[in-house]
């Protein structure tokens, strides 16, 4: 792992050194991991890809750096985020809070809470050589770090980024919290009769299983009643007693 600046604008020497360092890594055929979105999505939807590191990777490969490059799109899905409430505040217009010792102490206290699982799935690999050929860029050879990417190679970078993001989306995991969110957040008061909630959870799970978005999409095996029990365990939802039947509602202050 290595750390880099968030922005390279106006830093030609830094950019040159980073390019050369990346080239030296790829020449040795060392696996490299980076996140095209540049950060974690606040909404669950994919962010627009940031292609800086990807462009450097393609540049290094066009200089003859190591074996053919293969990108493995990787999906990460969280059932519950430690920063959930903070994200809701940011989406409501509140300014992003600066990191502090007090914030670190608050985060440490949250460790005792149950946050569920982190789901990981792998999408269909993207082969750089195939995309280069599709954009008539497979003949390009760069001799030095200072040579800019020609238009065909720039188009290749954008195409690779798009393919990676699409393949991440096709490898999504529909977990219990995803289904609970779909059912409860679509109601006016974020609450629903428990029996109706169970039926809707089962219906959406059957739909996702029988008509999948992609063969790589994975759907939770839990039935509706089990999904509610799981949500109660994570303290994401609550059961409100009622003479006409219990109500399932989202817990207060949930992100």
Regions found by a protein language model. Name each.
Residues 1-255:
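Membrane-interfacial terminal anchoring regions of lipid-handling membrane enzymes
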